[in-house]
């Protein structure tokens, strides 16, 4: 099997303090990339710096802060070079039945999970175009394809990211920049650890492989899409869900 080598690459991973984002940041650093991971708090950023060590650092970023997002891209370029791998992982949920959902619950999920993804993607384009290479990898969700009761806002945002990614892939493909999505299913994270055995058993009835995925499964998919081996893959969604959703 060919080993992934990302030496010389500069990766920005949002929402990297724990869970899937942490696994992604660690995997990219292991493959040789210089990784900048974001968190919403100073303590989260410090945790990222600690686990990355010489492989990169953590920074504080609210992805909804438009000015700060653009500033961060400039700061990374000055310190490490232009971002060559962007992983849009940061996201939130505010689940509610449609009839009870407030505009604020809709707006905040769309802002964080869709608008901010588009903003950061646009912000890294100049550097990628100048280098004539780049990887944009957006973490979506099985919910964006299958839907889920109580998650109308979340499903809309994640489906929107998939559509946006395809449009952007067509627009910038000639510059040797790929844009893809990874859609995780049920992944074993802090969130699933709060579920009862009965709840997990019910979830697993929907998964042909019969188990929860690991954050490392998603990280491996990101590593592949970031690698030279995936240079002819763009505008697609890679489903990492144990067969829960198939198309």
Give the predicted meaning of each segment:
Residues 121, 157, 165:
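Active-site helix of classical SDR
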